[in-house]
Amino acid sequence: GKKSPAALLYCLDSHDYSTVEGIDGYGWFTQDQIRWYRDRSAAYTGANGGKPLPALAFFHIALPEYVAAWRNPDNTHIGRAAEDECPGELNPGMFAAMVESGDVTGVFVGHDHDIDYVVAEKGIALGYGRFSGDDTTYNNLRPGVRLLVLTEGERGFETWIHERDGRIVDHVEFRDGRISKVKNSN
């Protein structure tokens, strides 16, 4: 028989630099992209009997909401931020669209080499990968990758950093809109 999707992965283009005259810095999502996301999310939710499928989103440049989430002392913070986040200067509303649609449980970005944290904001985990290449102009974290494990039928996931030498750090569980460190994790 035909199988239905159990989860969604959104791989999106957050662009590179601003294309708006007079606004410097990094790019952001366009309204067309946000509309595309909302349409896909609504279609999958409708096909699933009105219940949003659990989803993860991946793109390069952090959303502006990362900054406030990391700096909020009431949030649980797991990982490191050895530099400031570098989102685009304008906030087009992609995070609001994800909160309203109800499917995305985690957003993972890169771009900033010295950040690898995970923090929850409005029921969505906001996380960074880990710098995985060789030396660049800056990278104070050890090279590694962020791994994610989804469990079918659950609206959550586990994630951790696997460093190049095999060391596992910051094993995190995301359930019910909250992150927590898994016991026996560095």
Feature locations, PLM:
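Short, solvent-exposed loop/turn segments at secondary-structure boundaries
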Residues: 22-25, 138-140
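His/acidic metal-ligating clusters that form di-metal
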Residues: 8-11, 23-116
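Serine/threonine-rich low-complexity intrinsically disordered regions
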Residues: 19-20, 72, 176
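Binuclear metal-dependent phosphoesterase catalytic core
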Residues: 1-4, 94-96, 115-186
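Active-site-proximal beta-strand elements of phosphoester/diester hydrolases
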Residues: 6-16, 58, 124-131
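Short, solvent-exposed loop/turn segments at secondary-structure junctions
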Residues: 15-17, 61-64, 131-134, 153
